[in-house]
Amino acid sequence: MATVYDVPGDLLVERVAQRLKEIPEIKPPEWAPFVKTGRHKERLPEQEDWWYYRVASILRRVYLDGPVGIERLRTYYGGRKNRGHAPERFYKAGGSIIRKALQQLEAAGFVEKVPGKGRVITPKGRSFLDKIATELKKELEEIIPELKKY
């Protein structure tokens, strides 16, 4: 059985985002169409369903790095801000988006909070991601036969 480590992250996040749309606990808040994802961004996300992609990416990040807190995720999703003539500077991403996404993942049972440490993935969340990774790896093996070695 393949794990998250065995497949490309971008393809996995895309597939997980499609599956998360079917889960009733995970839905974008009413303010989601109007917000930037951080201070460093100039514009809103272009995709209509960007919320599901961010939640899928956070779920993958908790799987890989857990236990992980909101501040570490803010740093991961942050970036450099263009300040005109002034030198660029790193700014963290917005915390509300990450906080609400983690709360929705907790409600769905994919993530749980460990006091003093942060969020970790639950067995249900690990199984959810590993099943999708296994399906994705089988599809990739048909396209790229060299992947059967792994």
Curated annotation (Swiss-Prot):
May be involved in maturation of the 30S ribosomal subunit. Part of the 30S ribosomal subunit. NCBIfam families: PRK09333.1. It comes from Pyrococcus abyssi (strain GE5 / Orsay). GO terms for cellular component: cytosolic small ribosomal subunit. The keyword Electron transport does not apply. One of its GO terms (biological process) is ribosomal small subunit assembly. It comes from the Archaea. This is Small ribosomal subunit protein eS19. The keyword Ribosomal protein applies. PANTHER family: 40S RIBOSOMAL PROTEIN S19. Keywords: Ribonucleoprotein, Ribosomal protein. One of its GO terms (molecular function) is structural constituent of ribosome. Belongs to the eukaryotic ribosomal protein eS19 family.
